Amino acid sequence: MLIAAFAIAYGLLAVFVEHSYYLLILAVVPVWAVMGLAWNLLSGYSGFVSFGHAAFFGLGAYCVALAQIHWGLSPWIGIPCAAIVGAAAGLVVGIPTFRLRGHYFALAMLAYPLALLYVFEWLGYQELALPMQREHAFAYMQFEDHRIYVWLALAMLVGAMVLTSLVERSRFGMSLVAIREDEAAAEAAGIRTLAWKLKAITLSGALAGAAGGFYAVVLLVVTPPAVFGMLVSAQALIVAMFGGVGTLWGPVIGAVVLVPLSEVLHARLGNVIPGIQGVVYGVAIVAVILLAPEGVFWKVKDIVTRRRAQKAPVASRTTAIVAALPARKKNPDGAIVFEVRNASKSFGGLQAVRDVSIRVRHGEILGIIGPNGAGKTTLFNLMNGFIRPDQGQILLEENDMAGRRPYEICAAGVGRTFQVVRPFRRMSVLQNVVVGAYVNAESDANARLVAEDALAQVGLLGNAQQLAGTLTNKQLRLLEIARALAGKPRLLLLDETLAGLGTGEVEEVIAVVRRLAAQGITIVIIEHTMQAMVRLVDRFVVLNEGALLAEGLPQDITRDTAVIDAYLGKRWRIANA
């Protein structure tokens, strides 16, 4: 409804504008809004900041211009072709460039339009003028009434907004946001991060290519600096950042505010202050960084949300799960679900894991303990694919998982939490867990049902619509368990799930873990809270300096002299004498 209302209002605005220059401005505003949406699809949702969207924009512009000049191709066909060229360029660019992260990715993206600028100049395309076709004005989009350009640009923008809206609400959009929030956690939850990023840059390239193609039709002249120049990429980035990254309306807000302002100032003051358009965008980005770092949309939304929260009654917090549980039947002779066989891993001269072998049986709770730096988290990273062992095997029901990606191991049935909690903070509690459910869900509706069930099991169903970033430490720990649980794991790896919790909170989380184990889920837990671990686990594995120090029942391990000397310490010996 909002999109329709915006389209009607913007379309009617063109009716009341007579001056051709202002109609031109009204026509290019949607073009830059589409460019902002294209940038946003990649950088706003997935978090991979691009300084190179001018590459797709310029290729689209030259595609339309060259096709019309050499083959007489109508822009009605040329613009879809420009979108295809942009999509192909996005895929070709993405395959090697996604090997990079952070500012390395951004700088690599910057290289593509700069290279293309010189390539097209070298090819002799310093300035291409689209041939005039007055006798076939409609076929070649050369209208005497410039309002038609406004309405066509608006139609393209509405299409891009509808597409973005569909992406935003789909598995595609949720996966991209999860990647933006925490790529490692997303992959551990079963998301094929590279595949989704390639889809994002392909779709982003298509939108940018279409925008470039229409831009060429409106201006009738294409030059390398105008379509491949740094200001093109900067405008796409700035209109999105000004309005709000990772949102449908952010790029539209940015384009509606900044494009008319920069163009009008350029017309009025361009002779006095050359390059004033760049000044406008520069001031805009500085202002938004200082006053609204996430953009106008998020600033307004946060203000409205805070006001509503102040008026609303305080909702009940996590429902504690401390009811009496049926005694869990231990099965020391159960089938082996997971096995680490002679695994070793070194980082330079440091051997973090040395020839470690452990077996985990179906339905048991195995505790892994040891001093800091013993190799516990490294072992977990070997078990769920974040690092590859230098030697040895990682076996899930006799299938070797060594070298598999975390999303593959998650899909095979291994869930994981992290030592430092890694929620998707800008997503709701329910959305966090839905992301974890996607890996084995039959449909989006099924993923939601599975997520709600997982939240109910950990006592967070009442917090489903709350932003994950507002949860307490205990709730975040439970949220990670729920997200891992939503993937229907056979083996659950819990990395210091009790860290930072008070005594009462520890009991609540232990109750949840016991409940899951009673359902037949096999659990391996790393923890330093020994009093709780002794009551929780069936068996201990003790690591020290990367090697296996001891293995056995809790009552045996807590009396083992070597374990006391290496880890538990004299206080434990005295307290339990």
Describe each model-derived feature in a short phrase.
Residues 299-344, 572-577:
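ABC-family P-loop ATPase nucleotide-binding domain
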Residues 94, 267, 325-329, 342, ...:
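General structural signal for alpha-helix termini and helix-helix connectors
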Residues 11, 100, 161, 226, ...:
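Residue-level detector of alpha-helix boundaries and kinks
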Residues 333-339, 343-577:
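Glycine-rich phosphate-binding loops of nucleotide-dependent enzymes
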